[in-house]
Amino acid sequence: MSFDYRALATAALVAISSLALAAMASGPEIKTAVTGKTIHGNMDSTGPYAEYYTADGVVHGKDYKAKWSVEGDKMCWTYEGSPKDCWDVEISGDQVRWVKDGKSQGSGTIVEGNPNNF
């Protein structure tokens, strides 16, 4: 009896890919998760962050403001001097993962309200 390890590996990759895709949040889920909340986390390219997301689409950070929106099933940010940048989002409870071009680029923890008083 012979076992086809390639078939098993292929099946495992398909299953993992399906799980990853299923975990991406929808537009309404993103809005519900972030509106009126603060997210503390770390981005691979820029390091630690804390941002408060208002219902009217403003992002408040320690020393800056920006705009946020949801377009389709992506969250978009427009920081001063930069073009709009949209990302996929994975949400699990109070945890968020920012995904760009299929790769995780950062993560954070969602906290109720504006504890930093931004």
List where the protein language model places each region.
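Lipid interaction determinants
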Residues: 2-3, 13, 18-118
